[in-house]
Regions:
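C-terminal domain-closing interface element
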Residues: 145-175
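Short beta->alpha connector loops
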Residues: 5-8, 31-35, 55-57
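Short acidic, glycine-rich surface-loop motifs adjacent to enzyme active sites
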Residues: 1-11, 117-118
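Low-complexity, intrinsically disordered flanking regions
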Residues: 5-6, 18-21, 111, 136
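Extracellular S/T/G-rich loop segment that most often corresponds to the catalytic His/Ser-adjacent loop
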Residues: 24, 38-114
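Catalytic-core regions built around general acid/base machinery
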Residues: 8-29, 37, 41, 47
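Hydrolase catalytic cores
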Residues: 79-155
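Active-site neighborhood of phospho(di)ester-bond hydrolases with catalytic His/Asp-centered motifs
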Residues: 1-2, 27-31, 51-52
Length: 175
């Protein structure tokens, strides 16, 4: 969800609750107000995965709200994202650009697991739940500037498929 509000929205909240109960993974943009305001809604919800923005090296983007203590503060590429607008190449920044990057990263992990891992039904179900994917993102993250920089390279770079399969299985064994 590449949007956010300061106030509650009953319809959006109801949709999030329904999706969460159906074990759908939900990602929400943190906010672009920097340290001036907290996370927006729905990113404040404990039923979504809140996403902050960073540059391609994991450096904070300046637009994300301050990281919350004792909370996961995932950040993905959301600064100077190459885009097309009115037939021209432009570079856009914001947590609303970081959020689909996080969703795509999650989709890549899930597809890899579906095709390469010999998962039990229980493990597959756990991987597709918020808590399971949070564990995967934590395994792919490093602390940087108070944020949890999600870098798929931490899981894949220089590793064989067997190594990645083992990493995913180890994560699932801890759930």
């Amino acid at each position: 969800m590449s949007f956010g509000f300061e106030d509650q929205n009953r319809d959006i909240n109801a949709a999030i609750v329904r999706a969460f109960k159906a074990d759908k993974l939900l990602f929400a943009a943190a906010s672009n107000n920097g340290g001036n305001k907290p996370r927006s809604r729905p990113a404040r919800s404990d039923k979504v995965i809140c996403i902050h923005a960073c540059d391609g090296k994991g450096n904070k983007g300046g637009m994300s709200p301050s990281p919350e203590e004792n909370s996961l503060n995932f950040t993905t590429l959301g600064v100077a994202v190459k885009s097309r607008w009115k037939k021209k190449t432009v570079y856009k920044s914001g947590t609303s650009f970081a959020t689909p990057v996080a969703a795509a990263t999650a989709a890549s992990v899930l597809e890899f697991a579906n095709f390469k891992c010999n998962l039990s039904e229980e493990d597959r179900a756990n991987l597709y739940k918020r808590e399971g994917l949070l564990k995967v993102f934590q395994a792919m993250s490093t602390k940087r500037d108070g944020y949890d920089y999600v870098n798929p390279g931490h899981m894949w770079d220089g590793k064989s498929d067997e190594d990645v399969i083992r990493s995913i299985q180890d994560i699932l064994d801890d759930i």
